[in-house]
Every structure is written in structure tokens, then in C-alpha cells.
Regions:
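His/Asp/Glu-enriched, well-ordered alpha-helical/loop segment
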Residues: 220-283
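Glycine-rich anion/phosphate-binding loops
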Residues: 52, 90-100
């Protein structure tokens, strides 16, 4: 069985605005079924969605059992107003508003909570993020509130201090995790954080002219080196493509290929262990 522990059913890997517009007047069931058929044909038995506020992931979860797939979704991801994530998630201004949204997720039947706590990689400039992460105290409160409500927490997080803060706060999984240093990697390993590095979002940019290829190569090399280091620390790693992101189609197998390249002969055992932990925590 294959796992993809980070997808966005609402997106299509080509144009995020057009992809979202496809579902603005109602979720297109035929589209969702087509993607599920693709995953089924490739042997995927578990999918974890990063969320959307239009109900696309929710419908996919409802339909997935027909295709022999276990599907988990946070419904809409939660992001702080004025920071990255508003294009796909629900915004909050204060921790009180965040807590109310988490409680709402419980009533709506979310499987877990997804938080956005940093910016994105700038694929034209190695080492640069589009914005700084949230402060350590805020991250700690976000994780605590969701855990108090009984949810596991998936965190979009880049940058060493942001990821370290998330790990120390007890976050259940870190997504992306660009530009980590030894302290951040050790914090995740010691806390038992599952890292989903989404290498496909970088590797699939190679050979395309949208971004500076020198920067893309440097970013990918850095990420793969950190994957190797994290594995050597005994850290938990799980495969997740971020399917739907630009140049990452649904049903992509590139994540497995990149992680095999980074991890070597033990790659299957390492990924199976991490994926099973994702399945357990985000049940």
C-alpha cells in the first residue's frame, strides 16, 4: 500500500486560482472521483488532506471508502490574519477566535487541525522565506488549544526556529520544514514529531523555467541532506507530495523516488514506520 500524507484535493497542480474556481459554486464530484480513481489505480490506500474551505476534501473523505482509501481532512486549515494561508483556509485574529474555530471544527467533524505558522520558500532565492514564522508562545498556544479539544495537529512550518518551536510545543506533524538546522532536527526527533518534507514541491520544479534552477537545486539538496540527517537521528519521516501544488499532480510518485534517493536501502522501512504513525495519530 502507498500513502500520501499531504495532498490538497481542491488544487490541480497547474493553476490554483482556476482550481479553486472550479468548486466555488459547489464541489465538482466528478473531479473528485477522477482523482480518487487515479490514487486507487496507483495503489494508494491512505490520503491526508491539508484542507480547504470549500468542502472539497470533505467530499473526498465521504467518497474515499468506495475506492478502498482511508481519507483524513482538517476541513479548512487555520491561519492567522495577515499571514500565509488565507487563500485556502480560515483566518483568525486572536487566540480566542482560533479556539472558537477549533471548537467549530469539532462540531463539523474534522479529523484533525491544520495550522499555518510560517511563510513559503522563495524558489528563486535559496535560504529565503516569504515571511517569518509566528512567535514561539503563539505556536505553543495554538497546539495546546487543539490538543485540548482532542485533535492531532498538522503544521505548515518552514524555518529552523519555527519548526523547533512547533516540535517543543508537541505538534504531531511538520509539513515542508525548509532550512532546518541541527537544533530543529534534534527537537523533532526527540519529541517524536513526524516530518513530512514534501520534496516533490521542490524536485518537480527541476527542468522548468518558472524559477531559478540554481536556487531550486540548492533548495532540494539542502532538504535532502536534512532528510538524511533526520533519519540518522531516528526521526519519523512520512511521504507526502503536497499534491495539487504547482507541478505536483495528484497520484505523483516523485516523493517516493526522492525519499528513496535521500534515505538509501532502508527507505521503505523508514517511510512505512512514519506513515503508520501518521495513520495512528490522525485517525
Amino acid at each position: 500500500m502507498r500513502w500520501d500524507c499531504h495532498i490538497h484535493m481542491v488544487l490541480d497542480g497547474e493553476n490554483w486560482r482556476q482550481a479553486i474556481a472550479r468548486h466555488r459554486d459547489g464541489v465538482q464530484e466528478a473531479w473528485v472521483r477522477q482523482q480518487l480513481e487515479t490514487y486507487q489505480a496507483l495503489g494508494f490506500g491512505y490520503l491526508r488532506d491539508g484542507g480547504d474551505r470549500w468542502g472539497v476534501g470533505k467530499l473526498a473523505r465521504d467518497l474515499a471508502p468506495e475506492y478502498g482509501i482511508t481519507y483524513r481532512t482538517p476541513l479548512a486549515p487555520l491561519c492567522k490574519a495577515g499571514h500565509y494561508g488565507g487563500f485556502i483556509g480560515q483566518r483568525y485574529e486572536t487566540l480566542k477566535e482560533y479556539a472558537a474555530l477549533v471548537a467549530e471544527k469539532r462540531r463539523q467533524g474534522a479529523d484533525f487541525v491544520k495550522i499555518m505558522i510560517s511563510g513559503l520558500m522563495d524558489f528563486d532565492r535559496f535560504g529565503v522565506l516569504t515571511e517569518e514564522g509566528l512567535d514561539e508562545q503563539t505556536i505553543r498556544e495554538l497546539v495546546h488549544i487543539a490538543h485540548q479539544e482532542g485533535f492531532a495537529v498538522m503544521a505548515h512550518a518552514n524555518g529552523p526556529r519555527t519548526v523547533e518551536a512547533a516540535a517543543l510545543a508537541g505538534v504531531d506533524s511538520v509539513e515542508h520544514g525548509a532550512y532546518l538546522d541541527g537544533e530543529a532536527l534534534s527537537a523533532m526527533a526527540q519529541a517524536g514529531t513526524v516530518w513530512v518534507p514534501t520534496l516533490s514541491t521542490i524536485g518537480n520544479l527541476r527542468g522548468r523555467d518558472r524559477f531559478d534552477q540554481g536556487a531550486v537545486t540548492a533548495i532540494l539538496d539542502s532538504a535532502m541532506e536534512n532528510v538524511q540527517k533526520f533519519a540518522s537521528l531516528g526521526g519519523l519521516l512520512a511521504p507526502g507530495t503536497d499534491a495539487g501544488a504547482w507541478a505536483v499532480p495528484h497520484g505523483s510518485l516523485t516523493e517516493y523516488a526522492l525519499l528513496e534517493q535521500a534515505l538509501g536501502p532502508e527507505w521503505e522501512t523508514i517511510l512505512c514506520t512514519g506513515a503508520e504513525e501518521i495513520c495512528r495519530r490522525f485517525s
